[in-house]
Swiss-Prot record:
Task of the protein: This protein is located at the 30S-50S ribosomal subunit interface and may play a role in the structure and function of the aminoacyl-tRNA binding site.
Gene Ontology biological process: translation
GO molecular function annotation: structural constituent of ribosome
Record family assignment: Belongs to the bacterial ribosomal protein bL19 family.
Designated name of the protein: Large ribosomal subunit protein bL19
Parts of the chain that traverse the membrane: none
Gene3D superfamilies: 2.30.30.790
Keywords of this entry: Ribonucleoprotein, Ribosomal protein
Any one GO cellular component localisation term in the record: cytosolic large ribosomal subunit
Length: 115
């Protein structure tokens, strides 16, 4: 990577991010601005992908809300995310879990591993 770009992005990298992988269930505390107020919105779901590297790394979280699948993509190093909690560690053999989009109910479950 270009040393100039690397030196600019070093100060913006967050160090309070827990180690999580695709298949893990996470609880993301995102800051949401509504008018003049700012509040914390919790989004809990399964991590189905992690993409990129460095300052531009992102992850996608999927949950089922009222029978409808909802996915949100968050940058890892954004200040808009207050904190990330790992709720459960999942055992998967893929880096991208896009096949979960086609599964429903108990078929969409992921086996849990103890850490």
């Amino acid at each position: 990577m270009n040393p100039l770009i690397q030196s600019l992005t070093e100060g913006q990298l967050r160090t309070d991010i827990p180690a999580f992988r695709p298949g893990d269930t996470v609880r993301v505390h995102a800051k949401v601005v509504e008018g003049t107020r700012e509040r914390i919105q919790i989004f809990e779901g399964v991590v189905i992908a992690r993409k990129g590297a460095g300052i531009s790394e992102t992850y996608t979280v999927r949950k089922i809300s009222n029978g409808i699948g909802v996915e949100r993509t968050f940058p890892i190093h954004t200040p808009r995310v207050d904190k990330i909690e790992v709720v459960r560690y999942g055992k998967v053999r893929r880096a991208k879990l896009y096949y979960l989009r086609a599964l429903q109910g108990k078929a969409a479950r992921i086996k849990e591993i103890r850490r």
